[in-house]
Design a protein with these regions (language model features):
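Short coil turns linking two alpha-helices in DNA-binding domains
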Residues: 2-3
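An amphipathic alpha-helix adjacent to DNA-recognition modules
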Residues: 8-34, 48, 52, 69
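Hydrophobic alpha-helical connector segments
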Residues: 20, 33-59, 112
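Secondary-structure edge/capping motif, primarily at the C-terminal ends of alpha-helices
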Residues: 36-40, 68-72, 123-130
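Amphipathic alpha-helical segments used for helix-helix packing
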Residues: 55-84, 92
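C-terminal peripheral helix-coil segments that are non-catalytic and often amphipathic
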Residues: 89-101, 113, 118, 124-156
């Protein structure tokens, strides 16, 4: 079946089909991510597990790889300009309540926002220095950020 035929079969056409697919994939992504993080017992370990798990999941997503290869510009745009607010909102609604076991609500939301942006940025433009898919590398890179959230500097 051709793409055009598929688009015609889906009410709303191509854009509606792609939007439904994005929502489905985000739901699946957070379900996979949640499997291993609900029992973690510290703020730092929770956020490291989220970043490492998200990075690994993004890297192993076959459909995302195909989309990036076939239409890199529109795929990157859909992960940044178009969908970033929704991705951050979904990440916040999923991760922040788990982080609130360790820190206040505002800190949990700010940390989730920052780490979502970092994770997507490092996925789309990998660093030769930091590998957020590697637990040790992610921990070494992220711990200074966490200490700033948990122990904010006092201003005189």
């Amino acid at each position: 079946m051709s793409r055009a035929t598929l688009y015609r079969m889906f009410p709303g056409g191509r854009d509606a089909l792609l939007e439904a697919y994005k929502v489905h994939e985000l739901d699946e992504f957070f379900e996979r991510l949640g499997a291993g993080i609900r029992t973690i017992d510290s703020f730092e370990e929770l956020l490291i597990a989220v970043v490492v798990g998200a990075t690994r999941d993004l890297r192993s997503d076959h459909h995302l790889a195909v989309m990036l290869a076939a239409e890199p510009g529109s795929t990157i745009e859909s992960l940044t300009v178009e969908s970033l607010p929704r991705i951050i909102a979904m990440a916040t609604s999923f991760v922040a309540p788990l982080a609130e076991r360790f820190v206040d609500r505002d800190t949990a939301r700010a940390a989730t926002d920052l780490l979502t942006r970092l994770t997507l940025s490092y996925f789309l433009a990998p660093s030769p220095v930091v590998d957020l898919g590697d637990e040790d590398s992610a921990r070494a890179f992220l711990l200074p950020f966490f200490s700033a959230f948990v122990n904010p500097p006092t201003h005189v």
